[in-house]
Curated annotation (Swiss-Prot):
Similarity comment: Belongs to the universal ribosomal protein uS14 family.
InterPro entries membership: Ribosomal_uS14, Ribosomal_uS14_bac/plastid, Ribosomal_uS14_sf
Keywords assigned by UniProt, alphabetized: Ribonucleoprotein, Ribosomal protein, RNA-binding, rRNA-binding
Subunit structure: Part of the 30S ribosomal subunit. Contacts proteins S3 and S10.
Pfam families: Ribosomal_S14
GO-annotated cellular components: cytoplasm; small ribosomal subunit
The protein's name in its UniProt record: Small ribosomal subunit protein uS14
This protein's record includes keyword Glycoprotein: no
Length: 89
């Protein structure tokens, strides 16, 4: 489980990215780089990092499922992820 402060910080960044997305796109299209520099740093989507939706773990993130490999493995063994089966060959 990630620290609550790290999870909260990531959520705050996501909110800032969503808030400034239209303004950032307009400034970028106009070529106003001074205006872009005046926006908050955390409003840039590059600064976002994928985190596990269940416990906030930042490493070993599986983009297709939105969770880390550890939670993916647990839920897959329980059969709670649709379309995922244990491999056998």
């Amino acid at each position: 489980m990630a620290k609550k402060s790290k999870i909260a910080k990531a959520q705050k960044r996501e909110a800032l990215v969503a808030k400034y997305a239209d303004k950032r796109a307009a400034l970028k299209a106009a070529g106003d780089f001074i205006g872009l520099a005046a926006l908050p740093k955390d409003s840039s989507p590059v600064r976002m990092h994928n985190r596990d939706l269940i416990d906030g773990r930042p490493h070993a993130y599986m983009r297709e499922f939105g969770m880390s490999r550890l939670n993916f493995r647990q839920l897959a063994h329980k059969g709670q992820i649709p379309g995922v089966r244990k491999a056998s060959w």
